[in-house]
Swiss-Prot record:
This is GMP reductase. The lineage of its organism: Bacteria, Bacillati, Bacillota, Bacilli, Lactobacillales. It catalyses: IMP + NH4(+) + NADP(+) = GMP + NADPH + 2 H(+). GO terms for molecular function: GMP reductase activity. It comes from Streptococcus uberis (strain ATCC BAA-854 / 0140J). The keyword Oxidoreductase applies. The gene is guaC. Belongs to the IMPDH/GMPR family. GuaC type 2 subfamily. CDD domains: IMPDH (cd00381). GO terms for cellular component: cytosol; GMP reductase complex.
């Protein structure tokens, strides 16, 4: 079965244009529905400590974008939910699967967040299934995202356990070294893995990792994603929480993986690394550019909303679309 499955990644695929039916690309609707809520773009800044903090989360929510707050400042999660709700903003947090997280989830019954993401590296696990069931029992109205996974079997199991969406991607990210350290993952075939998983899914899929260009967002939607989680493209902004570093007069921002020793604070089961990214402008400018590029994608797809992207044909070009250029 596996040998018969087409294997490709983002750089191997080109989408084939259809006749344009809109007068201006600005007419294209990039909004997406997730649960009971609509958001301006089908993108999520990765729930990593060098990508998002409470200030950025608050601004994203105010501006109509989806976000997932990371789980690495555990004590601040309840006050964060309270502060968001006081402003009539959605609260979207992350949890792990350790024993104390069960009591934490139960403690949220009086002020339940709208979204909870179970965030572990290998999401096809009994511990994740157990946590999904616990959240659904304690917080029945909360939308549960579970991950990360890389197979249809995992998607079906997590959905059957009660997950409202699954996050697909094992180690394809720019600062993830799972594929090197363990030999496992979807690195190098993330887009094919997304396609494979989406065929089995009955609920939304979130593609997570391996996004290097804005065009990859359109490709993710073509192959079954409802939303796309992105790390490196959202890192390095002026507002980004990563530490600012100056080298020879140039400024950089730190960006490191959630399973790196920099995140863990110890060199144990390390599956992430740290890199320096040249500082970019403001996050709002990147979001605007993403929207404009996605509107262009929709116009090439021959429609007026994201659904048009799901119907386009494609060709597999095996790494040739860059013609020797680097990203």
């Amino acid at each position: 079965m596996f040998n018969d499955m087409p294997v490709f990644d983002y750089e191997d695929i080109q989408l084939i244009p259809n006749k344009c039916i809109i007068n201006s690309r600005s007419e294209a609707d990039t909004s997406v529905q997730l649960g009971k809520y609509s958001f301006k773009l089908p993108v999520i800044p990765a729930n990593m400590q060098t990508i998002i903090d409470e200030t950025i989360a608050e601004q994203l929510a105010k501006d109509g974008y989806f976000y997932i707050m990371h789980r690495f400042d555990e004590e601040s999660r309840k006050p964060f939910i309270k502060r968001m709700h006081e402003q009539n903003l959605i609260a979207s947090i992350s949890v792990g699967v350790k024993e104390y997280e069960y009591d934490f989830v139960t403690s949220l019954k009086e002020d339940a967040p709208e979204f909870v993401t179970i965030d572990i590296a290998h999401g096809h696990a009994n511990s994740v299934i157990k946590m999904i069931q616990h959240i659904k029992k304690e917080l029945p109205e909360t939308f549960v995202i579970a991950g990360n996974v890389g197979t249809p079997e995992a998607v079906r199991e997590l959905e059957n356990a009660g997950a409202d969406a699954t996050k697909v991607g094992i180690g394809p990210g720019k600062v993830c070294i799972t594929k090197v350290k363990t030999g496992f993952g979807t690195g190098g075939w993330q887009l094919a893995a997304l396609r494979w998983c989406a065929k089995a899914a009955r609920k939304p899929i979130i593609a997570d990792g391996g996004i290097r260009t804005h065009g990859d967002i359109a490709k993710s939607i073509r192959f079954g994603a409802t939303m796309v989680m992105i790390g490196s493209l959202f890192a390095g902004h002026l507002e980004s929480p990563g530490k600012l570093v100056e080298i020879d007069g140039e400024t950089f921002k730190e960006y490191y993986g959630s399973a790196s020793e920099y995140q863990k604070g110890e060199h144990k089961n390390v599956e992430g690394k740290k890199i320096l990214l040249p500082t970019k402008g403001h996050l709002s400018d990147t979001l605007t550019e993403m929207k404009q590029d996605l509107q262009s994608s929709i116009s090439y797809a021959g429609g007026n909303d994201l659904a048009a992207l799901r119907r386009v044909d494609y060709v597999i070009v095996k790494n040739s679309i860059w013609n020797g250029d680097s990203i």
